[in-house]
Structures are given as structure tokens and as C-alpha cells.
Amino acid sequence: MMDSKVHSHRLLFIAFLLIVFDQATKIAVKGFSLLGFTHPGMFLGESISVIGEFLRFTFVENPGMAFGVEFGSGKIFLTLFSLIASIGLVYYLLKIESAKIQIRIAIMLILAGAFGNFIDRMFYGVLYGEGPLFYGLVVD
């Protein structure tokens, strides 16, 4: 049983690493200026070929939920929902230690995505001058 608990903590650590990687790539796409170094980033809609036409990175911003679906209650609800969902997923991941690893990995990936979107909505509006706290666009 202890081994499963270690796995849950390992999965949370992997989720943390995925969130860091997700945010680093988003900052690289959006651009930044730090300590005299400026990286211009990509233009909205710009696409970069990674492996020919098979794999391309395209800069898009999502104002809503999955697939751009808008929600009537506004950004503050989506931001809080992302936070609450992330907390719930952490709790659930720690509680289902006996579940199959595939289920736990799927939950870990959903957690990383939900928390990454929370960070986007929370801070990107302020950092990039697009809106107040809680009103940033999700960079996809």
C-alpha cells in the first residue's frame, strides 16, 4: 500500500513538471522581456513546422473552455472552477491509490491541464496587458 502512495506523490511531481513545461512553452510563445533580454515570441495565428506538415505549433488563444466554448457566467467562474477542479483532482488522485495506473495517469494529465489553465486565466491578462487578474486568455 505504501508503494501506491509513493506513486501518487510521483504522479503529482510529474504533474508539477508538466505544468512548469506548459508555462515555459506558453511564455516562449507569448514572448517576454527579462533583465535586458527580449524574446518577441510568435504572432497570434503564426504556425511553426516541427516535423513537416505532420506536427506544427500554432499560436492560438482560447477565450473560453474546451474548444473555445464560451460560458455565460464569465471568466471569474472559469478561473475558480479550474482551481476547485485542480484541488479536487489532487485529493482524488491521493485517495484512489489502489486504482489502475492508467486511470491515475489520466487524472494526473487532466490535473496538469486544469491547473495550467488556471494559471493562464489568473495571470496572463495582467502580465500581457490583456485584462485584469482572473481574466487572462488560455494560451493553447
What is each of the regions a protein language model found here?
Residues 1-140:
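Alpha-helical transmembrane bundles and membrane-interface segments of multipass inner-membrane proteins
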